[in-house]
Amino acid sequence: MAAATAADVAEDTASVYSGKLTLYVFLTCGVAATGGLIIGYDIGISGGVTSMDTFLGKFFPSVLHQEQTAQGTSQYCKFNSQPLTAFTSSLYLAALVASFFVASFTRALGRKWSMFGGGVSFLAGATLNGAARNVAMLIVGRILLGIGVAFCGLSTPIYLSEMAPPRLRGMLNIGLQLMITVGIFSANLVNYGAAKIRGGWGWRVSLGLAAAPACVIAVGSLFLPDSPSSLINRGRHEQARRVLRRIRGTDEVDDEYGDLVAAASEIEVYSGCSARRRPWRDVLQRRYRPQLAMAVLIPFFQQLTGINVIMFYAPVLFKTIGLGGDASLMSAVITGLVNIVATFVSIATVDSLGRRKLLFQGGCQMLVSQVIIGTLIGVVFGTSGDGNISRALAVCIVVFICVYVAGFAWSWGPLGVLLPSEIFPLEVRPAGQSISVAVNMLCTFAVAEAFLPMLCHMRFGLFYFFSGWVLVMTLFVSAFLPETKGVPIEKMTVVWRTHWFWGRFYCNQDADAHVQVANSKV
């Protein structure tokens, strides 16, 4: 019954809403999606830079010495260094703190200025890191990068979901994940080239070139219109109608415009006009409990797939299993290319197959490949970490890492960003997305901090640890995640109210209020 009701909403919307995928909205979403470049570039650049001897020699000489004298050291432990880990993870701690302030900024000034602020902050951090003279400059630069990631990570997914036609929301929103994968791949290519620069300054090129994607989103955002939902929420109704006409390519937008206004009017029906000033309190109310649970659990599960272990530390990990410096960087390039190609699979299927099927299939693929990777590494190095790996077996491990990355890239990667951005009602959307980003940053920080020590102590069992979590999240999705494909974000409440489990959080008064709002739309 629940699934049929949600499907009926999607079908009714497709028949009532006018408009199509216009070139204007495609270009607009494409420019906004470049916010993912800064996120992806940093993910890809960090692991490559920390595998460069010149970078380690300047900022972390003890790690370089440990690596070079690792004959008696476990392969699992030779890169274990708290200062090195802090360099990588400091960005995500900064993004965690910033995300709570970014929500108010995004709600008050709109999505486009939030994206602009992210680009400017990331540009400042890239400049500081490229010119770094000491570890303190590196960390301050990382903090500025983290603030930029918080701005873009919160505002861009919301913007894409609000601008896209409902039937194509998944495809256009996943453009953000595509840009993240392009950023990772570009960073891997930059690292591969920078490692060959003579004179020991190649790492400056890697870190400094983060300014390029920062400039793209900062400049591009200046030419973007704000989304109709954001404009309505700030009382700019006529401007919202004009933007809606342009992005839909038709003057017949009364039905969609009316639904957007009605969704904004739910604030008054439920709580009165003052609710506009208290989204943080409202998002904790019972009727938003289902969305809040997903906003917390989806990014939590996404990070416990172990993907950032691969993306942060791919060159270091490949060095650990016995590949040389150039070979490890090239292997990271290969996984980055797989990431891009597999993301196109999600773009092509997310609005036809739906979210649930992709998450289930991707979860099964990641589970199997992680178990195989852990087993192969365990066979070679055992629990002691001693031993040498053959080139053939190293290549085999890289292949299964690529299988794992592909499974993530068409499931938990893009959908971990899409789902939190499309499930919240307008009045609490920035606050809800802020919570999702904060959880993502907290979990990313924890994984980045813990990975090298966990690899040292858990050894190959670390991959079994992550595969266990993949099993848990796959079962969770099967039982508790409703299908949201094709359902307009202004009508998303029906998906939760008719769900077998989440429906209990909606009382009759809530349902009556929702009907009242729907009947009063203009």
Curated annotation (Swiss-Prot):
InterPro entries noted in UniProt: MFS_dom, MFS_STP/MST-like_plant, MFS_sugar_transport-like, MFS_trans_sf, STP/PLT_plant, Sugar/inositol_transpt, Sugar_transporter_CS
Presence of keyword Transport: yes
Q: Which residues lie on this side of the membrane: Extracellular?
A: 46-82, 133-134, 191-204, 313-329, 383-391, 456-459
> Which Pfam families does this chain map to?
Sugar_tr (PF00083)
Highest taxon in the source lineage: Eukaryota
Give me the Cytoplasmic side stretches, as residue ranges: 1-24, 104-111, 156-169, 226-291, 351-361, 413-434, 481-522
Q: Which GO terms describe its molecular function?
A: monosaccharide transmembrane transporter activity; symporter activity
- Output the Gene Ontology cellular-component terms: membrane
Q: How does it sit in the membrane?
A: Multi-pass membrane protein
Q: What is its main location?
A: membrane
Q: Which keywords fit this entry according to its UniProt record?
A: Membrane, Sugar transport, Symport, Transmembrane, Transmembrane helix, Transport
Q: Which residues cross the membrane?
A: 25-45, 83-103, 112-132, 135-155, 170-190, 205-225, 292-312, 330-350, 362-382, 392-412, 435-455, 460-480
CDD domains hit by this protein: MFS_STP
Localization recorded for this chain is: Membrane
Family that this chain belongs to? Belongs to the major facilitator superfamily. Sugar transporter (TC 2.A.1.1) family.
**Summary of the function given for this chain in its UniProt record:** Mediates active uptake of hexoses by sugar:proton symport. Can transport glucose.
> What name goes with this protein?
Sugar transport protein MST2
Query: In which organism is this protein found?
Result: Oryza sativa subsp. japonica (Rice)
